[in-house]
Amino acid sequence: MYRIRVFGDPVLRKRAKPVTKFDENLKKTIERMIETMYHYDGVGLAAPQVGISQRFFVMDVGNGPVAVINPEILEIDPETEVAEEGCLSFPEIFVEIERSKRIKVKYQNTRGEYVEEELEGYAARVFQHEFDHLNGVLIIDRISPAKRLLLRKKLMDIARTVKR
């Protein structure tokens, strides 16, 4: 199992690098990430959240775990909805975030094969949230400065726990 990196850890702000090796090492890392995600009752976990600055994440929105490697968002529906989101890198913080209701995506599986699919609702939301992590974008970047100010003390408390 991995230790979750929390707000204040520099790896969360980096743009992750593409995966180039689809080997047993990657599969083992993904298995460990899935185990970690379930242990913390998450529905998604991006590689940067466990200290790996590479472009992949795992998610499970009810149909079993999926590994998403080198993802792209091909189309974003202009229709959006606002819903509450949490994040394992922000313990006990939940914020309302506006995201597209439907997206068309492309990614690679653990064998390096390309997968293209359309996601909507909760699956689209989780994909967008995890995709943000690969670009160094965090949930607090998606809220207003006023709301971020209200969370300032909690954020500072979380950042103090980061091992430097």
From Swiss-Prot:
What cofactor does this one take? Fe(2+)
Cofactor binding note of this UniProt entry: Binds 1 Fe(2+) ion.
Key words, A-Z: Hydrolase, Iron, Metal-binding, Protein biosynthesis
Enzyme type, top EC level: hydrolase
Binding-site residues, Fe cation: C87, H129, H133
> What are its GO biological-process terms?
co-translational protein modification; translation
Q: Where is the active site?
A: E130
* Entries under Pfam families matching the protein: Pep_deformylase
Q: Which family does it belong to?
A: Belongs to the polypeptide deformylase family.
Q: What does this protein do?
A: Removes the formyl group from the N-terminal Met of newly synthesized proteins. Requires at least a dipeptide for an efficient rate of reaction. N-terminal L-methionine is a prerequisite for activity but the enzyme has broad specificity at other positions.
The UniProt entry, under NCBIfam families, shows: pept_deformyl, PRK00150.1-3
What is the recorded name of this protein? Peptide deformylase
Source species of the chain: Thermotoga maritima (strain ATCC 43589 / DSM 3109 / JCM 10099 / NBRC 100826 / MSB8)
Q: Taxonomic classification, please?
A: Bacteria, Thermotogati, Thermotogota, Thermotogae, Thermotogales
